[in-house]
Design a protein with these regions (language model features):
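Short alpha-helical segment that forms part of, or immediately flanks, the ligand-binding pocket
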Residues: 26, 45-53, 67-68
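Aromatic "clamp/platform" in nucleotide-sugar-dependent glycosyltransferases that forms part
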Residues: 40
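Conserved acidic donor-binding segment of nucleotide-sugar-dependent glycosyltransferases
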Residues: 72, 76-83, 92-97
Length: 135
């Protein structure tokens, strides 16, 4: 990737961070303007959930469970076979920074609900209770 960036005269605009510890990764998320998930194959990407939890504006390909995680008004989801939409949405984040920040805040609220340990524990216990009653 670094060679490709250099070949396209982007070497001074793209920073490859290498391996990061937990705190460094959190800071990298907080320092960025946009989180981009251009994957063509995903399930339920942890990196998207982490970006959402930190309120980072997100642009993600509509693959796997992405659209179940990132809802309208919380970020941009684009068709994975349409890279021009990826470019468009990244541009929108920079053009409409206030809107992007609001979407990041909405994504954070969604992620806080989805990843709430107490709620998840209650829901799981209820599932087990129902299963036990059916036995």
């Amino acid at each position: 990737l670094a060679r490709l960036a250099d070949k396209n005269d982007l070497g001074d605009k793209i920073h490859f961070l290498g391996a990061l510890n937990e705190q460094q990764m959190k800071q990298a998320f907080l320092d960025c303007n946009v989180f981009v998930l251009p994957s063509t194959i995903e399930n339920s990407p942890n990196s998207l959930g982490e970006a959402m939890l930190l309120g980072v504006p997100c642009v993600a390909a509509d693959v796997g469970g992405v659209s179940n995680m990132l809802h309208p008004g919380q970020g941009y989801v684009y068709q994975s076979t349409a890279p021009y939409m990826l470019a468009h949405y990244i541009t929108e984040v920079f053009r409409q920074q206030e809107r992007a920040e609001e979407m990041g805040a909405q994504a954070r609220l969604q992620a806080m609900e989805t990843h709430n340990p107490e709620k998840n524990m209650r829901d799981l216990l209820e599932i087990y209770r129902v299963i036990a009653e059916e036995q």
